[in-house]
């Protein structure tokens, strides 16, 4: 070899090592010139530490002098030892433990607070322990929570009460001490904090930063793992741990309850021992004298081992349970779990007889009977219905399914249907109750087909409709055609003649025509339902008899069912139908138009009469009677009859009482006085327009052959009509007219002496041949009706003056 070289190689165990003898080894001076390519081994220090002054001096001195100099060493602070002080702090009683590293698995230690107590805190703690017991750890936790909840601004006392779950006195004392100590402290917090490096780089040259973050390096190689699977495993592990913790908490609570029960049992035994109750007589007396609680609809669940006895009574009604007084057994009986027979599908549960009713003994409900750990009962989970059963069920997906954890009671057939089954007539009525029949509505007037009426929540009437093949024909039926048919209780179940059809089904060949359906209704073979209309006179008579003297009736008491329709008869016009709000408004507008025309005609006649009085003063009476005496035609009579208010005729005793009061009013013309009263919104069309007086029509006066209407015109002020004392002496005569008004107005009236207009009206009526005379008794009777029923007035408001009205 031309040049001696040496390279460090890894040792090979299979290659034998060369052995050199001492005489064969070269001299050290010869080996110095050998170029050794030895890699520099890491020193274990950072570059800044390697360049330290003392370290470099020591290394260079060793290389130069080939030995270690005493002066060339790295300076190290001297370690001082004080043995006496150490022995005083740590006693020499040391025992070597069995193991130095002790790990408690599954031990979840609470997080220790960051705050540490000092001597000042110990002084406060000793003072607080005189009144209440508080541990140092509890005090540190309270101060730590207050410190972490407040940054630059301190928390208030109310916020501290929400943070600390302690006594109010303790919270107040600790809070005041903490606020005082925090203000005296110069630092930002009572908890000493280590200064750390900030991410913005402002603390790079700060020598007080104790810990600095490592420089983030790029990871050149990635270990590809299934992160999702590991995440799921961690979630599963967390759920298992939380479940284990929950089970342990429940076991802890159960054992604590059992311990309390044991202590109570021992106390009872000690009391019985001191009282000498060895046979249990005193204990039985205490149990008997205790008042039994009522059994409610939802029985309370007993937390003991006798759950199976309560489960047997779940399907029974609580009223069928009975308690049997028996002496409590000393020996605990073994529990029995009877198997319940499976009920066949489609069979309803039968109502239990009194012989088969379960009897709950008081001895079964033990006072100290609790469920231990080995008596876990699992609730019976009902198996879901199979697909075949769901397909066969007519309700499909909406079928009733029992829900776990709910108690279902059997229907009480003894109260629901027993009285129906005993009485055959009631049973027939109960069958008719669930039939669908042809139904018509009043508002709107139409036929809705076959329906069944039932009562819903709050007393609402609900109509359940059924689809039949006769619906296209039934829609053509006019409800007026069904008014003349009389209902009969002997009806045939027409529902069996038709079947339910879908929209896609073909029309049935056996569909009845409209004439056949009407003939079936007329012959009572088909049941037809129509809302019954109440008679106004019946309602008024009932209210008059039930009402006390002086008591008024509300204006809202007349419902829509009391409104009748107009039907013609031989004796005249009878009202049996209803009016809507639009018809009422139209009628009011027509009355206003008629009133304006009458006022214009009266004004013209007054001017003509005034001119004729100057020329022919003697012929004034005859001309006036000739020009103003007119009768109504049929159309005007119908129109005026629709606005007349009628009331039931009071008894003779009532009329005689009112006759003796001294009110002398003739022909039913009443002059009301006093302030007017605003009515409902339908009268605003008349009351809002100035110069137009409201219309008040006086009730009809009963007669043997004919009914007479004397309409009156009521004005809001005497200035509206300047003919208060004029010669309006004509009366209106209607033959064969009797009306019923659907409107009742609650109002008070006051009568006065008859006006000259009323006296002239009575004189002209007596002189006319076509108008029969109105007797004073009938007039007083009408006035008595006015006084007895002040709530019934016309369609519009009050007025202070009453004058006659002429209808043309």
From Swiss-Prot:
Record cross-link Glycyl lysine isopeptide (Lys-Gly) (interchain with G-Cter in SUMO2), residues: 135, 195, 324, 362
UniProt keyword Transmembrane present: no
Compositional bias (Low complexity): 595-614
Residue ranges with Polar residues bias: 615-630, 658-682
Keyword Isomerase included in the entry's annotation: no
A Gene Ontology biological process term: regulation of cell cycle
GO cellular component: NuA4 histone acetyltransferase complex; nucleosome; nucleus
Database matches in Pfam families: E_Pc_C, EPL1
Location of the region described as Disordered in the Swiss-Prot/TrEMBL record: 337-357, 371-397, 595-630, 645-682
Family of this protein: Belongs to the enhancer of polycomb family.
Function: May play a role in transcription or DNA repair.
Name of the featured protein: Enhancer of polycomb homolog 2
Lineage: Eukaryota, Metazoa, Chordata, Craniata, Vertebrata
